[in-house]
Amino acid sequence: MSAGGHGVSRRQLLVSGVCAAPGISLAGSRPRVTHGVQTGDVALGRAVVWARSDRPAQLVVEYATTPSFGGRRRVRGTVASAQSGWTARALIHPPPGQTIFVRAWFEDGRTRGEPAMARFCTPADGVRILWSGDTAGQGYGINPEWGGMRIYETMRRREPHVFIHCGDTIYADGPIPAEVRTPLGVWRNWTMPEKLKVAETLDEFRASYLYNLHDDNVRRFNAEVAQMWLWDDHEVRNNWSPGADLAGDGRYREKDISVLARRARQAFLEFAPIGYASRAEALIFRHLPVGPLVDLFALDMRSYRGPNNWNRQIMESGETAYLGERQLSWLADGLERSRGLWKIIAADMPLGVVVSDGRDAQGRPRFENCANGDGPPLGRELEIARLLQAIKRLNLRNVIWVTADVHYTAAHHFHPDRAQFKDFLPFWEFVSGPLNAGTFGPSPLDNTFGPQVIYCKAPPPGQSNLPPSAGLQFFGEIEIDRSSRCATVTLRDIGGGVLFSQRLEPA
């Protein structure tokens, strides 16, 4: 990550970025942290601190291992500007195994704003990781009568070291109306003008992130838990892939999916607590060495895929691309080099669940992820088969997959004895979500890699798109014990109750 704002002069702050935020007078007032502080991408010896300003100003961060800020260190971060959606970030270097106390403020060359506070824990040996996905989907937004996005408060109380958001961090294509009528009654949202339509402009994509930050539970969670964000389809549009045809979707005046994707990516990188030297060079797939017991690998299943299609090609090509060659090689190499006992791969879509995307011009089923129905590897499955082969060839043990996307929770065990393709080591995949969205499922499995449903919690037969008030909102937890070195994976409900738990012994 660049020190972008380091060495920025008073004159640069006052004139070079200076298209002021609308409605803000620079004179006589202080720059303000508008939506709290987030921390993210915590790895050995580094973390990112994120905040948003109300005007052109430079982010300044102090951090320490005591609440009194004795022995504090100060870092100057990037400059918030109109070009960054008024967001800024700073790279800090905290010690492992500590609670890190953070205060962040903005300076505009004339004045220093009031600090906003945060804290997070850096892992050492024992680690607690949560994951889930799907925030503010299907029109279910912030319902003050119900207590807002309550699952974030439940997760905060679990005191994790890291939370992995497996994607659908927003629903850019999902307006938030004032009311949603459901079989359980009327769901009443707090909403705002930008969320009454689908996102098309850059500012509308930004507004979806700002909407979530209006929730008290989300902001409290952000201020106490370091995060690792992935993206999925709804950051752009449902089932987004290159070449998607918007001609028949009257909600969109902008019909070029590549234009929407470019704007969506910029907004995601502005609001995600990710470190990077420049947005143009930023990668959503990345490796976070959390400690001696665990390495995290975040995947990007969107940026490098070919168009969604019938997905049953017998040879790889641009049409079958999923992770893409660069990311696939990076992942295999990173897993081989990993020093963490447990290797957790965070994906935005499950491997063996069939996710459909309508039909193509020839009337053939079209698929959204790699799964395409029973049988040998075809289409996008060819990449996954190569990856699983590499893991076996390198004898890489203790690999766990976590994901979201399908709006229910499940534990899947993959084994070559049940599979059509047999050249891989057995592994587990755990699914959890949604966080604050409609609940669906379950979806059918594809037997190519031999998945078995060990546990599943979804709506009763005949019911779907249930509101958060139905109680079927889920997150997962991985607890790695420093003494036994075992990983215990637990699927939890909106109140934190245990639905399923699996203890995994290290190989």
What do the PLM-derived regions correspond to, one by one?
Residues 2-19, 23-507:
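Metal-dependent phosphoester/phosphodiester hydrolase catalytic core
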